[in-house]
């Protein structure tokens, strides 16, 4: 009989136990792994609102524009205030402000008259016309005051016979030209013209003296009235003005550049002192027009073209005749 090795049996039993234990462990692993693999995923924690959302492939509609609030008005007298918008609309006009003055586009302008004989020009007063000055003893311009419209087209208007204006150069025909100053010349002119145009006995009253300034040229004026001895005559009035510069002492100085205005009136048709002053101050020297420019020098005639060279013509000597002795 074969004797069984007791160690072999013990080994087989130990091996069998190990095999059974291994199989049991494998079954436990097999059951646990599928359970863990097939379980639902753990829910993700909530996403904070500040986190950026994942980009979307679809184009999202644009968000409505946020209205921009207008900037607050700058405080008055602020040293660091920003300048206003140059393109901003101007503020509305004050409804209570007075309207600007309206200037008539067709307002008549004063008529300016040249007087070549006296070498001056002046502005014609409103309501006056230029008359024929050929019969004047002194002066070179005569003005008359109109009293109405012309009776017929093309005819002169009616004029007053108790007032007139005389203008001219203060030349040697008048004693007043010898006075060195304009104030003395105006007073002397008024005295002489008063006696010439109002040769009636009376007394001078209401005498005045006025300074003149014609665009920087000084002058002076004198005014007085005459109370005639005849009570039937209205008081006479005379306004005389002298303006310009007296003659210089230089030997090569030209004629004196002084002109005068004599405005005659009466109590019935008084002198307009303001208009007389404006008339005297409107006097300007009449500047002669500049001479015509000299004609341009004629262009020199072109030089004649050089003549072609001409070959000299050979000359044949003339035979000489010998006379017998």
Swiss-Prot record:
Sequence repeats lie at residues 85-88, 94-97, 104-107. It comes from the Bacteria. It is found in: Secreted; Cell surface. Residues 1-39 form the signal peptide. Glycans are attached at residues 49, 57, 66, 316. Its main location: secreted. Glycosylated. Runs as 45 and 47 kDa protein, the nature of the difference between the 2 forms is not known. InterPro entries: FAP (IPR010801). Residues 38-110, 286-325 are annotated as: Disordered. The keyword Phosphoprotein does not apply. Might function as an adhesin for host (human) cells. Cell surface Apa binds to human PSP-A (SFTPA1) via its glycosylated sites where it might down-regulate the immune response; PSP-A probably binds other bacterial proteins as well. This is Alanine and proline-rich secreted protein Apa. It comes from Mycobacterium bovis (strain BCG / Pasteur 1173P2). The gene is apa.
């Amino acid at each position: 009989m074969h004797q069984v090795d007791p160690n072999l049996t013990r080994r087989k039993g130990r091996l069998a136990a190990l095999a059974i234990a291994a199989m049991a462990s494998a079954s436990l692993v097999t059951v646990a792994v599928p359970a863990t693999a097939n379980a639902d995923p753990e829910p993700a924690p909530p996403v904070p609102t500040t986190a950026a959302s994942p980009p979307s492939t679809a184009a999202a509609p644009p968000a409505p524009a946020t209205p921009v609030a207008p900037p607050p008005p700058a405080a008055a007298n602020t040293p660091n205030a920003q300048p206003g918008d140059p393109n901003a609309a101007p503020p509305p006009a004050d409804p209570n402000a007075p309207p600007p003055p309206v200037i008539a586009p067709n307002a008549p302008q004063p008529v300016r008259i040249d007087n070549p004989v006296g070498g001056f020009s002046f502005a014609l007063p409103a309501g006056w016309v230029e008359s024929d000055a050929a019969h004047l003893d002194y002066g070179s311009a005569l003005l008359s005051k109109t009293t109405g419209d012309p009776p017929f087209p093309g005819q002169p208007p009616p004029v007053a016979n108790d007032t007139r204006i005389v203008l001219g150069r203060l030349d040697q025909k008048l004693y007043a030209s010898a006075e060195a100053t304009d104030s003395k010349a105006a007073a002397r002119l008024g005295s002489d013209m008063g006696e010439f145009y109002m040769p009636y006995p009376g007394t001078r009253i209401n005498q005045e003296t006025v300074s003149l300034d014609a665009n920087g040229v000084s002058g002076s004026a004198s005014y007085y009235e005459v109370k005639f001895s005849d009570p039937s005559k209205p008081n006479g009035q005379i306004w005389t003005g002298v303006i310009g510069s007296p003659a210089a002492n230089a030997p090569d100085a030209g004629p004196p550049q002084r002109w005068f205005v004599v405005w005659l009136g009466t109590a019935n048709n008084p002198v307009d002192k303001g208009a007389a002053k404006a008339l005297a101050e409107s006097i300007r020297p009449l500047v002669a027009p500049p001479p015509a420019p000299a004609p341009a020098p004629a262009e020199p005639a072109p030089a004649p073209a050089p003549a072609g060279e001409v070959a000299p013509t050979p000359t044949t000597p003339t035979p000489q005749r010998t006379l017998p002795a």
